[in-house]
């Protein structure tokens, strides 16, 4: 298992406007993580205990629409 920012296939993390911890916790659990929250500094969902195969944010740029 690993911790990190879950992403779609385009290396774009999930934004949590309004610092919605419940949204991020559900999103993370739907991805089989243990839990999650909205990291306010980046306004992005952060997950704890994601499966190793689940993609997480890398240093590359977000490329919307590229799967």
UniProtKB/Swiss-Prot annotation:
Cellular localisation: Secreted
Entry's Gene Ontology cellular component terms: extracellular region
Secreted is among the record's keywords: yes
Residues annotated with Proline amide modification: 64
Disulfide topology: 12-62, 16-38, 24-45, 28-47
Stretches assigned to the LCN-type CS-alpha/beta domain: 2-63
Example GO BP: defense response
Record family assignment: Belongs to the long (4 C-C) scorpion toxin superfamily. Sodium channel inhibitor family. Alpha subfamily.
Known role: Alpha toxins bind voltage-independently at site-3 of sodium channels (Nav) and inhibit the inactivation of the activated channels, thereby blocking neuronal transmission.
Protein name as catalogued: Alpha-toxin Tf3
Species assigned in the record: Tityus fasciolatus
Classification of source organism: Eukaryota, Metazoa, Ecdysozoa, Arthropoda, Chelicerata
């Amino acid at each position: 298992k690993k911790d990190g920012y879950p992403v779609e296939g385009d290396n774009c993390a999930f934004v949590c406007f309004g610092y919605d911890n419940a949204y991020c916790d559900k999103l993370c659990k739907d991805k089989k993580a243990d839990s999650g929250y909205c990291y306010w500094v980046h306004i992005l969902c952060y997950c704890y205990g994601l499966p190793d195969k689940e993609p997480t944010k890398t240093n590359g740029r977000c490329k919307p629409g590229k799967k």
